[in-house]
Amino acid sequence: MLAGSGTIRACAAGFGTPELDAAQMAEIHRLIEQELAAGALGVSLGLGYAPDCFYSTEALIEALQPLKNSGIPITVHMRQEGSGVVDALREMITVAKALHTPVEVSHLKSIGKANWHRCTPEMLRLMQEARQEGVEIACDVYPYTAGSTQLVHVLPPESQKGGLEVLTENLADPAFREALKDRMLTGSDFENISLLVGFENIVASSISRKDLRQYEGQSIAAIAEQQGKDPFTALFDLLQAAHCDVTMIDFIAAEDDICDILRDAHSCVISDSTYPTTGMLHPRVYGTYTMLLEHFVREKQALSIESAVHKCTGRAAKVMGLKTKGILAPGMDADLNIFDLSAVHTCATYSDPAQFSAGMDTVFVAGRPAILNGAFTGSMAGTVLTR
């Protein structure tokens, strides 16, 4: 478990407070210390989301002072993954230097064709240079070119000041909509997904409001065409009607960039899964690790089987400080996954995502068989992992 910085900030200062006073900052420190004392493995930042997006770099460093010199990791969805992604990484290198504690950049990527094959190599180079200077910074990646998050993430982050109910109310205002549209048509100072990849690559994957669920699995461009609207109007109408409770799957990244990240010796693999109770899952919920093994190891030969397994086990355990996980050795937890690489197959797809992978037939958790001959044994030996 990680302590969520956004939740901590919202508890201390509300959802839409850009500037923090001394009492609010002190409460953030207290809550971080409380979560770490309870066993949190680290602190997770979402700088691309409200309310974390309201931190300046200086205020962020101040908020994270309880982690200074601790060796406790900070994981981060950076402030940008689009045209400003390299500068966003530089910001996190600055944070890592100031706090002298590890930073793990979550799901590293470069969004948009204009940034593919250009920003990712630069970021890998910058992290390597920082490590040579003694800075602990690395990254993880998921093996899919599509991401998934809340649909409001296509809007400028300042639109979420006050929370989603306030945003829903504001979307009823034509002037507010027009201002959003103007920002989204040209803005490069935020992760402007609609500009970078187009509405045809932004799919509404789950919608809370039942009478709108006919649009699940359709792109915003397709919804707009059906409704006879422009894509901005269709987007704003959908968000307003659903009280902003809509998730998306967005096709944003380049497979060659994923290969470059996987080849980096310091990267890990992440599923970055979310679990909506309605609509369409992202196939990574079921298929991340077999996609890595089947597609990137066996088919593309982007990395060796040994390296791939290490990124999912030993490397990941080291990053999170899990001292009894990740390797096979006396005294370690006996967590084993036995598979034949030639038989591994990802069954989950974007159109049919809730499908178990094939080939993962024997799994032990804490030395007890959880899956034998491909069937669940009923054993539930897993425990909550704490620091």
Task: Give the label of every model feature segment.
Residues M1-A22, A26-A50, L64, T94-K97, ...:
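Active-site neighborhoods of metal-dependent hydrolases
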Residues G39, H77, D140, G228, ...:
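Divalent metal-coordination and catalytic microenvironments
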Residues D52-Y55, Q80-V86, K113-W116:
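Acidic-and-aromatic substrate-binding clefts and catalytic sites of carbohydrate-active enzymes
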Residues F54-A59, H117-C119, I249, P283-R284, ...:
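Short glycine/threonine-rich loop-to-helix capping motif typified by GTGT followed
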Residues I61-I72, V76:
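Alpha-helix-loop-beta-strand connector modules within alpha/beta enzyme cores
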Residues D173, D260-H266, S271-D272, T288, ...:
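C-terminal cap of metal-dependent C-N hydrolases
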